[in-house]
Swiss-Prot record:
UniProt-recorded name of the protein: Fructose-bisphosphate aldolase
Pfam family, one: F_bP_aldolase
Enzyme class: lyase
Source organism (scientific name): Sinorhizobium medicae (strain WSM419) (Ensifer medicae)
Record's keyword annotation contains Metal-binding: yes
Binding site for Zn(2+) 2: D105, E142
Amino acid sequence: MARITLRQLLDHAAERSYGVPAFNINNMEQGLAIMEAARACDAPVILQVSRGARSYANDIMLAKMMEALEVMYPDIPLCIHQDHGNNVATCLTAIQHGFTSVMMDGSLKEDAKTPADYAYNAMITTEVSRLAHMVGASVEGELGCLGSLETGHGEAEDGHGFEGALDRSQLLTDPDEAARFVAETGVDALAVAIGTSHGAYKFTRKPTGEVLAMDVIEKIHERLPDTHIVMHGSSSVPQEWQDVFNAHGGEMRETYGVPVEEIVRGIRFGVRKVNIDTDLRLAAAAAFRRVADTSRTEFDPRKFLKPAMDAMSAVCKARFEAFGTAGNASRIKVVPMAEMARRYASGSLKPQAKRAEAA
């Protein structure tokens, strides 16, 4: 098997009505944990890398690690995705280092803190789409800002997130504007704002439609039935791992994530990519704390890392099964990026929108 573009993978997911978890990765242990789970489930994989992860691990290290994972797990279609690119250069250097997909997040300006207007977002996302598609790479765009409908605030992730408070209209993607944005930019996938946020502290109570606007996804899918929708900030923050974390010296306050059943509902309405980072961080940190608390003389890093890897793998397996990803790796025949570039050039991959009905 080879590296796969996001577009081909999500096209396959749409044809077979499943979703694909996109796990953030910073190091070898995360990579191995995710890929072991994928092998066990026969699931295709999206490994995504933030700008913070690229700074932490270095592009050369990450590129070589991805090469190693590709060789070690030859039967798993592997999409390597830039998460929350803040400018054209971030996206193009990712492609230069072997990424098959990039996200141009033009919902914020280049400082990754200031909300951008529609014109800026459409302009810069269109430019990234034009350049990436020339070499066959996929592009994800974002419309609307990721943040809490309870508070109006967003949670910065690796330095990416708006400052201050926004009103509800800025925190929810408008379906008509989404149709216009996809048509203008030519993106392969669209991240939408529905009240989710980065980090562990997403909701102060089990979310309802008041703070988790799944109906927005349904309306966008109605306008854009062939567009792949992306849910960001979609960790479920499992209670069992919160309990382990706190039982062994942690001080995590009560919080609620995005329920898995709501994500599964979203998959029925066009959600194809589901971003997950906090769940793996929490599982790994909880496993670390348990070893540190119960084996206080232990100092071999491997004795901490192996349980952390097992914990992360368990979360990944659960998501592959719940989202219907399991069983699909062996059904995919990877299309090379050069062929994807030819298809983009021919216009055969141009997005289509359903016209809005007159009032």
